[in-house]
């Protein structure tokens, strides 16, 4: 019989208020995604306050409850403090957390997904290139969850892909060879540079991505291709992308105060949106 109290390594990926003083917390653990409750965590002098912040890598002590397991202790292992001083990196962390929240099954063991998210937060905290880190994260996470886009064989006919002019089809699950370009009339054009970058990021360790020197045009193209692929799986864009795009735009054109105001408006919506749940048919 399972012990009534157990310990697990976890990353805090979502929070919301419950009752007068509790917090509902969604965590990613090596054993999958799980919703737990932190009793009294919103009270001023709660010993849990500050120990269940978003994106914190922590060791939790949980008591098995009737409906939700209860957080009895949290011992942070890494708060990723440097990440929290950069608004664009915070937005990237929100996006990374939202993807696992939407795609990882509840209480379905996936140690690799946990490791990928943890590695991504570490890379963002260490100052790695944000966009390339996220592209590598997307590709590795999709692979771990059974959504790996086909980049070495044609997604339609299975022929080995060459460095010819290929197209990318979210509907068929990856790149199309020239002979199959007409299979999906909505397939996206894909440059050779973007094709090579996607294959490289898919095949290399996550931490390598931050060391690459890639042109802005190729970076933007690969982002667009993977957004289209994820949009097909999730049936809409992740909510956090709108904030990340706003931050990037304002960093180029506005003052830091304007960026801070946008963050306040976005995060005033709360850490969670109960409508942002698992997409139908995504698994």
Swiss-Prot record:
Protein name: DNA repair protein RecO
InterPro entries according to UniProt: ARFGAP/RecO, DNA_rep/recomb_RecO_N, NA-bd_OB-fold, RecO, RecO_C
UniProt record similarity statement: Belongs to the RecO family.
Pfam family, one: RecO_N
GO biological process, one term: double-strand break repair
Phylogenetic lineage: Bacteria, Bacillati, Chloroflexota, Chloroflexia, Chloroflexales
Superkingdom field: Bacteria
Chain spans, region Disordered: 254-283
Sequence ranges of Polar residues compositional bias: 254-264
Gene3D superfamilies named in the record: Nucleic acid-binding proteins (2.40.50.140), Recombination protein O, C-terminal domain (1.20.1440.120)
DNA repair among keywords: yes
Keyword terms of this UniProt record: DNA damage, DNA recombination, DNA repair
Provenance organism: Roseiflexus sp. (strain RS-1)
Function: Involved in DNA repair and RecF pathway recombination.
GO annotation, cellular component aspect: bacterial nucleoid
């Amino acid at each position: 019989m399972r012990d009534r109290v157990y310990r697990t390594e976890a990353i805090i990926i979502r929070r919301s208020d419950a009752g007068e003083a509790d917090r509902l917390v969604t965590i990613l653990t090596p054993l999958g995604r799980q919703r737990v409750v932190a009793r009294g965590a919103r009270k001023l002098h709660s010993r849990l306050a500050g120990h269940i912040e978003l994106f914190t890598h922590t060791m939790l002590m949980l008591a098995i409850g009737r409906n939700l397991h209860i957080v009895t202790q949290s011992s942070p292992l890494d708060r990723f403090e440097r990440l929290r001083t950069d608004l664009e990196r915070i937005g990237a962390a929100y996006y990374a957390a939202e993807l696992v929240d939407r795609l990882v099954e509840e209480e379905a063991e996936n140690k690799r997904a946990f490791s990928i998210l943890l590695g991504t937060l570490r890379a963002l905290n260490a100052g790695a290139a944000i966009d390339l880190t996220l592209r590598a994260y997307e590709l590795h996470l999709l692979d771990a969850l059974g959504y790996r886009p086909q980049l070495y064989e044609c997604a339609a006919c299975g022929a080995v892909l060459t460095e010819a002019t290929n197209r990318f089809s979210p509907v068929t699950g990856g790149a199309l060879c020239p002979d199959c370009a007409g299979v999906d009339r909505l397939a996206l054009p894909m440059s050779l540079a973007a094709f090579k970058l996607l294959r490289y990021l898919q095949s290399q360790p996550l931490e390598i991505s931050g060391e690459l020197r890639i042109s802005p045009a190729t970076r933007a193209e690969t982002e667009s291709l993977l957004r289209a692929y994820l949009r097909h799986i999730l049936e809409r864009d992740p909510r956090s992308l709108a904030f990340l795009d706003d931050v990037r735009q304002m960093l180029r054109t506005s003052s830091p105060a304007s960026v801070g105001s946008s963050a306040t408006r976005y995060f005033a919506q709360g850490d969670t949106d109960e409508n942002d749940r698992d997409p139908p048919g995504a698994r």
